[in-house]
Every structure is written in C-alpha cells, then in structure tokens.
Amino acid sequence: MTPGLRTVGVIGVVLVGLVTSQPGAAPKFSDWAIPTNLGPTINSPFNDFGAAISKDGLSLYFNSDRPGGFGGQDIWISQRPAESDAWGPPMNLGAVINTSAAESVPSLSRDGHFLFFTSTSSGGLGDRDIWVSWRDHTHDDFGWEQPFNLGPAVNSAFFDAGGSLLENDESGEALLFFTSNRPGLGGAGTFDIYVSQVAPNGLFLPATLVPELSSPASDQRPSVRFDGLEVFFYSNRVGSLGNDVWVSSRKTVFDPWSTPVNVGSTVNSASDDQQPQIAANRRTLFFASNRPGGVGGLDLYVTRRTRSEP
C-alpha cells in the first residue's frame, strides 16, 4: 500500500468516530442580509476568492494571486481571536501546500483535520485535480502535512475542483461533492456537480453525477452544509444574471435534493458572484464577487441570516 493510500485510509478511521450523533429538527432561517465586503485587510487589488471557514469561525482560508506567493494562485489564511474580533492580516499557507503552480478553492472537513483544495501541480491527472492534506492539531493552521492527489476515482483528465466533504451523521456515510467539466449533462467545457463516496477503508469510490444539482449550463463549487440539508453552488444556468449563487435543500439526508433556486438579488448582482461557502453555524455565507465598489478584481464578501425555530 502506498503512503498516499495509507493517508486516505485515515479518513475512514476518523469518520467512524464522527458519524455517531443525530441531528435535531431542521431550523428555519430568515432571508440573507445585504452582503458586506470583507475589506482591505482581507481583500487586495488582485483576485481573492474561494473562502473556507473553520468550524469555530476563527480561521479564514482563501486563495489569491496577490504578490508574495509561490505560484499563480496560492492559499492564504487570516485568523482572529474571537468571532467578534476583526480578521488579522492574511498569511501565505506556505510551501507544504502552495507550489509554483496554482492552488485554490480550499475546503475544511467538519472536524478540521482535512484540507481539500485544487491544484495544477505536477502529479495530477488532468487540468486541475483535487488534493488533500491532514493535520494532527485542528488549531494549528500551519501544521498541514504533505498533500496527496485523491486519484482516479475522484480526479479525471479534465478539470476537477472544489471538494466539499459531507460526513453524514444519519447514514454513516462520508461523501465528497465536487465539480468537473468531464462529459456530463452540459456540452463541451461546461461544469457539473459530482459526488464520490468514501468507503469504510477510507478509499474513494468512483464519482457519479448528481443530476438534481447539475444542468446544461455550468454548475460549480458545491458547498454542502455540515448537516447535509443545504448545498450552495454557483451557476450561469437559466435564471442567472451571469454567475449567481444558487441553493438546493432537502428535509433529511435520505431525501433527494430539491430543484435549485437562485438565492436572490440581495446576494447576487449583475456582476460575477461565485465560490459560495456556508459556515458551520449555518447562518453565515461567504462568496466572491467582482461587483463595483470592491478592493480589487474578485473580492470576498459575507452575508448572514438569522435562525428561527420551526
């Protein structure tokens, strides 16, 4: 067994301890508030997008092509002592994760041990592949180990990106949702949403199309809520002004996904709105946009909603 497969096997071991609790009744939420730009501490005159937020809300990962990186796109991190505090200056995640190629679209597992991201580095199968890294200590943002490619069950000769791991408490399954432009529902060059199940031994099973979330247009960067009842993604499907943020929901993890709906004009704009990431608290949504009034090209924004019990 290769070192990479031994590391993948850790996923199965870790998930055994994670899929034990039972979620309560699904809460209801208000509409999303007007988004706010994360400001010049986080955003730069360059492109900043692909946000990922830690479960405790204290570490914000994202990718940027700002100066000071190792390649065309690097993953950066900003930290704060408490959720009520301002974000600190972004720091490059370092040479263990970043390379002279392009690293982007980070995503953290619910337990914080795994970092999934997209890379064009050598050793991949296609244009872009999904990689994963492990850390022992979930509060050590610079403790990531050497990443490895998820292999042909997930990656292809095409563009594969935006992994989002769902650890399903009710069914005991672990599922990796991601996007790919391999031949699917759309024509050449369009993106669909796929899912790969993690087997009990930690290995990924061959990915399959998620038809409820895919369309003849491009559907990208799924972000699955940790309880599995909502998935956010961005799309240029009919009903979008360009690239818009969309959402699909379901009552239980055993139900099919609902027909996706546009999250609306409060969040989306006539510009390019993309790369959504739903936080663990289920009330905070990060995304990127190049709408007027930003700091650079693509900027990071946040919108919030309040919770009201059924």
Language model region names:
Residues 9-19:
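Bacterial N-terminal signal peptides
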Residues 23-310:
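Short, conserved micro-motifs composed of acidic
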